[in-house]
Amino acid sequence: YTGSVDSWLNKGSYSIDSPEKREALRNMFAKSQVALIYGSAGTGKSTLINHISNFFSNQKKLYLANTHPAVDNMRRKVTASNREFNTIASFISEKNQHTECDVLIIDECSTVSNSDMRKVLEKATFKLLVLVGDVYQIESIYFGNWFDIARNFISKDSIFELTHPYRTQNRNLLTVWERVRNLDIAILEPMVKSKYSVRLDESIFSHAEEDEIILCLNYDGLYGINNINRFLQNSNPSLAIQWGIGLYKVGDPVL
């Protein structure tokens, strides 16, 4: 398998500029038919899925995820042919009879419950299995710990972890992300030093940037989406239009 990947890459028709991803692709099926890919947001998990897909471009590939946004993301990122996308709910439904593929790829595995994963494995017929996700991201609504504990009993030859982030090269941000991810007790220091954390006051309602992003922890409460939206809308001079129980103005922020 590794020799086949090397030969494919040496032809020069397809390039992988990340040594980390190149090594993962070269080795993931060298000793196993199952590959588990772990990585935090921004480390290129979707990009690696695309690399795998292009190597197996002539094989039939099935891509599954728990949510429609995750499925749509794979559909946008994967450029290879012979592909089919579906949500897990649709795949395991009784109506679905399309269950055979050469390569089965499941994304955002941390959101997939143990029960649904078992149903997928029982229903699908495949030669190679690729499981992708981040155990620190959103958990399954129903009980689902299989992706977290799988690396404790699956062969190390089948486990690959992407660690290099691509969304920023800012060392201060990378330090904050790493400490948050690892629940490091020293998280406060870099947040204060780099001014990523400030005391909330009335200044948050003042327009400071043309391209502002507002993140709210919930819908209700003083700093919830609903209240923040009302404050910002009241300062918007545009004409208000009522639609149902809501008021909308041109120029309203999207929260």
Identify the residue ranges that each predicted region occupies.
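Conserved helicase motor core of P-loop NTPases
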Residues: 2-12, 19-36, 41-48, 54-55, ...
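Short, conserved "post-DEAD/DEAH" coupling segment immediately C-terminal to helicase motif II
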Residues: 115-127
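Post-Walker A helix-loop "phosphate-sensing" segment adjacent to the P-loop in P-loop NTPases
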Residues: 55-62
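Catalytic P-loop NTPase motifs of RecA-like helicase/translocase cores
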Residues: 111-113, 138-139
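Loop/turn-to-beta-strand initiation segments
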Residues: 101-103, 126-130
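Walker B catalytic acidic pair
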Residues: 107-108, 133
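Structural beta-sheet core signal
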Residues: 63, 131, 214-216
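Inter-Walker segment of RecA-like/P-loop motor cores
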Residues: 62-103
